[in-house]
Amino acid sequence: MCALLSNVSSSQALRPLTDVRPIATLPFDCKYRLIDFPLSSLSNAHVDNVFMTFNEGETQSVFDHLGSGSEWGLDGFNSRYFVYIQQDFDRLKEQGKAYFAQHLNFLKKSKAPYTVLLGSKFICNVDLNAVLKIHKLAGKEITTVYKKVSPTLAAEYDTILRFDEEGKMSNCYMNQLENPQEKEALCLNLFIVNTDWLIDFIQEMQNAGEIASIAHLLRARMKDYDVNSYEYTGYMSNITDIKSFYDANMVMLEPQNFTSLLYSSQPVHTKIKNEVPTYFSKDSNVVNSQLGSGCIIEGEVKDSLISRGSKVLKGAQVESALIFTSSKVKNDAVVKYAIIDKNAVIENGVQIIGTAEKPVVIPKGSVVTEDVIEL
């Protein structure tokens, strides 16, 4: 198999976290990034050629995290990843040029009989070998992966699948859904398709002048084809806004969720950093929390996730918070129900307090010298 990995999803509701990075490189559970999950699913299925698309101006954190791609087996002689900018394809379309030429060239050169299409907005750990097996048995051109969830977990433009008595599938956007059921089949924007069929489909869409997004076209047009489906039953989070992102991290403090997502038979790979272990002073007090390596903890930490290289100094209190890489909570500061982005500093005695429904977000690199209390 080869893969097309789309990372162009965006949401104003995730700002300011996405002011400096794409959704794909949002931090998760102390040491991971969201893109680690689709890349790990691909790696575990021995997919060694990956075509990635990102938005213009959002690739710095991507290259910093991916490096050579070695952690996901993408640094070999015949194993590699390619990064393209979505807006370049949009401009080619505006100029009347062949805007899917790079995609078609990639698919033809891969010589892979099957192609995986996926994104990085959904946090899940899918066994693509199992999906491929079902795809082959079904004998259809397309297999899509879904999870049954409460409609409240779907964003307005997420795709909901419906099945009639004969198993034929139809689909619509969440905001078009009539009479929502207790559980709906949420499309995880993950497909396995026959590569020859995909090449013909892309060529047809290009000739018709359709939008320059294969993932969008496939979701919009799959009702016109005989599509097979695969139900994913593992852990899943849908990242749509600050609240959903905060909750997705916080539920990792529950052992069942942590084990299901990160320590199943499908390992999750991430960028390796050889750092010293975290230091806990004799006065520190840590309860029900997770911490990355290289931290210094002298204060109190409760129900929180502290990323690599962060500091919680003497007298500081951190509760129900996400502290990103290399941030510092100084002496006697209080941080509750908050997300402290990378390299931020909370000065001595400052209080950062939000609520579980609306956590306070401190932007990357901020130095906070005054209280921020939003109750």
Task: Name every feature range the model reports, one short phrase each.
Residues M1-M250, I362:
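Unchanged
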